[in-house]
């Protein structure tokens, strides 16, 4: 699937949710088990996901992906995800 700024944001969320755990497990042993190590691991996973999504880099897009990676099983995230129904990536990132 080709992803553009007009792509439904829930499709991108699904892509991130499906691939982040696998990337996390693959890279886990390459980073120390400290706050700094986990932060560096998160950044690496976000970079890999941004390459997979293949959109031009922006701080907003990276922050959006990082939020999905860091908080996938929280009530707040579930409510946020529900609020994105029907929106495009462009709507979310540039609002």
What residues fall within each predicted segment?
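Short terminal alpha-helical segments
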Residues: 5-25
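Acidic, low-complexity, intrinsically disordered interaction modules
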Residues: 22-87
């Amino acid at each position: 699937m080709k992803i553009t700024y007009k792509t439904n944001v829930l499709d991108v969320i699904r892509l991130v949710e499906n691939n982040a755990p696998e990337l996390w497990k693959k890279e886990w042993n390459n980073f120390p088990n400290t706050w700094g190590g986990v932060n560096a691991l998160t950044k690496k996973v976000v970079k890999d996901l941004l390459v997979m999504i293949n959109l031009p880099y922006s701080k907003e897009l990276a922050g959006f992906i990082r939020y999905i990676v860091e908080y996938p099983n929280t009530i707040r995230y579930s409510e946020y995800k529900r609020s994105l129904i029907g929106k495009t990536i462009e709507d979310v990132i540039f609002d």
